[in-house]
Amino acid sequence: GLLGTLGNLLNGLGL
């Protein structure tokens, strides 16, 4: 993802 610090789950999926 883009912001792994703010949302590891969401950003991890590419959201």
From Swiss-Prot:
<dbReference type="GO" id="GO:0042742">
    <property type="term" value="P:defense response to bacterium"/>
</dbReference>
<keyword id="KW-0929">Antimicrobial</keyword>
<keyword id="KW-0044">Antibiotic</keyword>
<protein>
    <recommendedName>
        <fullName>Frenatin-2</fullName>
    </recommendedName>
</protein>
<keyword id="KW-0391">Immunity</keyword>
<feature type="modified residue" description="Leucine amide">
    <location>
        <position position="15"/>
    </location>
</feature>
<comment type="similarity">
    <text>Belongs to the frog skin active peptide (FSAP) family. Frenatin subfamily.</text>
</comment>
<dbReference type="GO" id="GO:0045087">
    <property type="term" value="P:innate immune response"/>
</dbReference>
<keyword id="KW-0964">Secreted</keyword>
<keyword id="KW-0878">Amphibian defense peptide</keyword>
<keyword id="KW-0399">Innate immunity</keyword>
<dbReference type="GO" id="GO:0005576">
    <property type="term" value="C:extracellular region"/>
</dbReference>
<keyword id="KW-0027">Amidation</keyword>
<comment type="function">
    <text>Antimicrobial peptide with selective activity. Is only active against Micrococcus luteus (MIMC=50 ug/ml) and not against Bacillus cereus, Escherichia coli, Leuconostoc mesenteroides, Micrococcus luteus, Pastewella haemolytica, Staphylococcus aureus, Streptococcus faecalis and Streptococcus uberis.</text>
</comment>
